Amino acid sequence: MEGSKRRHDSRRLQQEQEQPRPRTPPSYEEIAKYGHSFNVKRFTNKEMCLKNDYPRIISYNPPPK
């Protein structure tokens, strides 16, 4: 029982450390160096859950008649 509590605390500490800092827009040098890779967004699990939270009806594709 103590182990599960400890694990939960460490997970909460990780989430606190992963608070996104305000992103400065990349400088022209960085854009020239890395190209489009700055536009690639890393999704957090919460964002993925929100994206996948649509009702099944929307994603359901009815068979052609």
UniProtKB/Swiss-Prot annotation:
What is stated as this protein's family in its record?
Belongs to the orthopoxvirus OPG052 family.
Q: Where is this region: Disordered?
A: 1-29
Quote the biased-composition stretches of kind Basic and acidic residues, using this chain's numbering: 11-21
Keyword list, A-Z? Early protein
Q: From start to end residue, where is composition biased (Basic residues)?
A: 1-10
Give the domain of life.
Viruses
Q: Which Pfam families match?
A: Orthopox_F8
The residue ranges crossing the membrane are none
Upregulation details from the record are: Expressed in the early phase of the viral replicative cycle.
State the name under which the record lists this protein: Protein OPG052
Name the species this protein comes from.
Answer: Vaccinia virus (strain L-IVP) (VACV)
